[in-house]
């Protein structure tokens, strides 16, 4: 007899209801809970799955390269980057008639326009034709196959790493720091120096000639003689035409600062220098930890030395090394939190300091990339706290952590939670109070009575980095300060030009509207943090439910006996935090997008005047920018925004469907399911189809998850359609 799904749980496989399917899906990746799972097997499974994950990523990127080479217009785009729309791939659809062709593409084939920035990236790194794209696609396909094979190999008995290998922290740190970060940065520097920089100067370097083509006229002599400054001499001039030798220099590692005047992207030679510096730092860092040779740092010793003499941290970090080493959830929480911060930084730097040629002129791509990276950062940070909570429930050992920093954090959790609560309340009432006050006085025709606060501290910080507009005369905004004098011969002239150039996004001028929305965002951040921190710190137990850890991560309720313990599991904290996270990133992206739309349209006054009261946001940002979207198709025909209007509508539908699961209870669904099953069994033809599992309604937690997923997907897709269409409608 065939084994029923799920194979990893005998108890679930023998469940006679549809619960078997849903719980099977829910726990498929919870390896710890699977039948017969050992710690060693757990580590080996996760390790092997990493190779599969990488294989999927390489296959996906290979597909990007392949479809652009096959169906895109990369070579035409390279010839005229500012006037050509980059195509992602063709669309085959019998619904598209002549009218649609004309409306969507203004050409003769239906295609998806690429808003991901890959064209700009490939162009910047030296790719110039479709053959190179095909070569890259093939290379990644081979790499994908290699990683799949490696994943398979590492679950074979002979090649399974041992548990001690996984827990050898020093060795792992050395290899990851020096290998993953250091050597990959060095390799990327090599690519920039040998391929990308020559291509930006009109010299093609490919597989056929890269060994014979020195990237610098002096070759390696300056490197071996210690005369490294030669590599920074004769940089590209301000008149350099990107992709040609006109105005090109010979420098390969520079510190110019600012942007290339024509492409408005960071200087390639600056980026090569940056990656080389990172490579050196990380390769050195990758030799710091003690392994076989008895030299270098020992992590346990370092951690346990962190014990202030004042005694305020109790036993300090004693016990942390063992706790971290033995808890995958602790490690995953730290990794997710770090990755979240990095992803949010990418969102910020991608527009403020564009690294890719001409991307600063592609407003839709900039908007899409910012929104994309901020939402990913939000999802990752919520995941970090979720796994932090699971760590406290499953992996935390009070005996091992007596009076150390972790134990003390748990001991004074009330102080942490109440302070966060106070900050959230303060920010919420004051910010909303200002917005509502301004809204009322504007509505009654007295806009001059608004309370408008200049963000003088933030303006002062901008001035320290060289913004002259505010007249602060401090640090880099004062030509006589030590900071300015020290950097005058290096990167400062280029940087100052960039900071004070009103046409880019670096250090935008800020005023009262920015002050208010920054505090609204701060409210969202602090409230999300409050929910996540409370969920993690109360995961083991609280005054209401001291034995909470015995109920696991995602219990729904424990009945009315203890005063009603609904909505207090660590899972419920994650659930509530997700809504606040989405809300907060909504405000962040609204702010970013509206400020940039007004900047790009040369109408900064619109944002400055309308962003200080609520109706300004609703009317002059949301309504004004969604109206062309809603008119994407109408009785008079369609235009190039029709697809986005359909997506806008459909995503709203997905979002609204979420509420059906969020605002209804199990009994209702159980009755409905039983009625439907009764009708099905008595309907001719339909009753030929039978199922073995008895249909039961989703549990409370499952229904909430289904509702949350619909809410999240609908929310993000609605804004994706809005941000792309409202930007493309103005600048395409």
Swiss-Prot record:
InterPro entries: PSI_PsaA/B, PSI_PsaA/B_CS, PSI_PsaA/B_sf, PSI_PsaB. Chlorophyll a B3 binds at residues 660, 668. GO terms for biological process: photosynthesis. It holds the Pfam family PsaA_PsaB. The chain crosses the membrane at residues 46-69, 133-156, 173-197, 271-289, 328-351, 367-393, 415-437, 515-533, 573-594, 641-663, 705-725. It catalyses: reduced [plastocyanin] + hnu + oxidized [2Fe-2S]-[ferredoxin] = oxidized [plastocyanin] + reduced [2Fe-2S]-[ferredoxin]. Its main location: plastid. PROSITE patterns: PHOTOSYSTEM_I_PSAAB. Keywords: 4Fe-4S, Chlorophyll, Chloroplast, Chromophore, Electron transport, Iron, Iron-sulfur, Magnesium, Membrane, Metal-binding, Oxidoreductase, Photosynthesis, Photosystem I, Plastid, Thylakoid, Transmembrane, Transmembrane helix, Transport. P700 is a chlorophyll a/chlorophyll a' dimer, A0 is one or more chlorophyll a, A1 is one or both phylloquinones and FX is a shared 4Fe-4S iron-sulfur center. It is a multi-pass membrane protein. GO terms for cellular component: chloroplast thylakoid membrane; photosystem I. Belongs to the PsaA/PsaB family. PsaA and PsaB bind P700, the primary electron donor of photosystem I (PSI), as well as the electron acceptors A0, A1 and FX. PSI is a plastocyanin/cytochrome c6-ferredoxin oxidoreductase, converting photonic excitation into a charge separation, which transfers an electron from the donor P700 chlorophyll pair to the spectroscopically characterized acceptors A0, A1, FX, FA and FB in turn. Oxidized P700 is reduced on the lumenal side of the thylakoid membrane by plastocyanin or cytochrome c6. The PsaA/B heterodimer binds the P700 chlorophyll special pair and subsequent electron acceptors. PSI consists of a core antenna complex that captures photons, and an electron transfer chain that converts photonic excitation into a charge separation. The eukaryotic PSI reaction center is composed of at least 11 subunits. PANTHER family: OUTER MEMBRANE PROTEIN, OMPA-RELATED (PTHR30128), PHOTOSYSTEM I P700 CHLOROPHYLL A APOPROTEIN A1-RELATED (PTHR30128:SF19). This is Photosystem I P700 chlorophyll a apoprotein A2. The gene is psaB.
């Amino acid at each position: 007899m065939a084994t029923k799904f799920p194979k990893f749980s005998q108890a679930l496989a023998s469940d006679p209801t549809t619960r078997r399917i849903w719980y099977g899906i829910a726990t498929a990746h919870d390896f710890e809970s699977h039948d017969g799972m050992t710690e060693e097997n757990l580590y080996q499974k996760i390790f092997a799955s990493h190779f599969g994950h990488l294989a999927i990523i390489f296959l996906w990127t290979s597909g990007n390269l392949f479809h652009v080479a096959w169906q895109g217009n990369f070579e035409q785009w390279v010839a005229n980057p500012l006037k050509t729309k980059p195509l992602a791939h063709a669309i085959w659809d019998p619904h598209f008639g002549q009218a649609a062709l004309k409306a969507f593409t203004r050409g003769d084939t239906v295609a998806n326009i690429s808003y991901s920035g890959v064209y700009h990236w490939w162009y910047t790194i030296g790719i110039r034709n479709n053959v190179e794209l095909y070569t890259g696609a093939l290379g990644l396909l081979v790499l994908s196959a290699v990683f799949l094979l490696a994943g398979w190999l590492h679950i074979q008995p002979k090649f399974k790493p041992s548990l001690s290998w996984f827990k050898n922290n020093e060795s792992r740190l050395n290899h990851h720091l020096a290998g993953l970060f250091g050597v990959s940065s060095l390799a990327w520097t090599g690519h920039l120096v040998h391929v990308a920089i020559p291509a930006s100067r009109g010299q093609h370097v490919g597989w056929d000639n890269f060994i014979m083509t020195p990237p610098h006229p002096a070759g390696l002599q300056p490197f071996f003689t210690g005369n490294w400054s030669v590599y920074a001499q004769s940089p590209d001039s301000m008149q350099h035409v990107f992709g040609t030798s006109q105005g090109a220099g010979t420098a390969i590692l520079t510190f110019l600062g600012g942007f290339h005047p024509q492409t408005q992207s960071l200087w390639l030679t600056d980026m090569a220098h940056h990656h080389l510096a990172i490579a050196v730092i990380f390769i050195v860092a990758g030799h710091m930890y003690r392994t076989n040779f008895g030299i270098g740092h020992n992590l346990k010793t370092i951690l346990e030395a962190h014990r202030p003499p004042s005694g305020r941290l109790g036993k300090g970090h004693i016990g942390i090394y063992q706790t971290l080493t033995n808890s995958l959830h602790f490690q995953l929480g730290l990794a997710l939190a770090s990755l979240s911060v990095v992803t949010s930084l990418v969102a910020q730097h991608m527009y403020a300091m564009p690294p890719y040629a001409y991307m600063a002129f592609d407003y839709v791509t900039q908007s899409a990339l910012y929104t994309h990276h901020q939402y990913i950062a939000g999802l990752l940070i919520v995941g970090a706290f979720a796994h932090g909570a699971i760590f406290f429930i499953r992996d935390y050992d009070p005996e091992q952590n007596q009076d150390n920093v972790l134990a003390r954090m748990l001991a004074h959790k009330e102080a942490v939670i109440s302070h966060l609560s106070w900050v959230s309340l303060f920010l919420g009432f004051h910010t909303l109070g200002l917005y509502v006050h301004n809204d009322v006085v504007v509505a009654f025709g007295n806009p001059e009575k608004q309370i408008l606060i200049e963000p003088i501290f933030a303006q002062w910080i901008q001035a320290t980095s060289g913004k002259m507009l505010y007249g602060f005369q401090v640090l880099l905004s004062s030509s006589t300060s030590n900071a300015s004098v020290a950097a005058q011969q290096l990167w400062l002239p280029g940087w100052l030009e960039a900071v004070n150039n009103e046409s880019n996004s670096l250090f935008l001028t800020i005023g009262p509207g920015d002050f208010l929305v920054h505090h609204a965002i701060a409210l969202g951040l602090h409230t999300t943090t409050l929910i996540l921190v409370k969920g993690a710190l109360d995961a083991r137990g609280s005054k209401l439910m001291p034995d909470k850890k015995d109920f696991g991560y995602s219990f729904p309720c424990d009945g009315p006996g203890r005063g009603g313990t609904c909505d207090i599991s660590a899972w419920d904290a994650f659930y509530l935090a997700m809504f606040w996270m989405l809300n907060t990133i909504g405000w962040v992206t609204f702010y970013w997008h509206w400020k940039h739309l007004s900047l790009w349209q040369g109408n900064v006054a619109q944002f400055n005047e309308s962003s200080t009261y609520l109706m300004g946001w609703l009317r002059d940002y949301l309504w004004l920018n969604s109206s062309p979207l809603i008119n994407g198709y109408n009785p008079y025909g369609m235009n190039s925004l029709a697809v986005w209007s359909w997506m806008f509508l459909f995503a709203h539908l997905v979002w609204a469907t979420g509420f059906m699961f969020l605002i209804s209870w199990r009994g209702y669904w159980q009755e409905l399911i039983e009625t439907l099953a009764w009708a099905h069994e008595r309907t001719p033809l339909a009753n030929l189809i039978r199922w073995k599992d008895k249909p039961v309604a989703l549990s409370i937690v499952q229904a909430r998850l289904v509702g949350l997923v619909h809410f999240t997907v609908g929310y993000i897709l609605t804004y994706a359609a809005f941000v792309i269409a409202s930007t493309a409608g103005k600048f395409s």
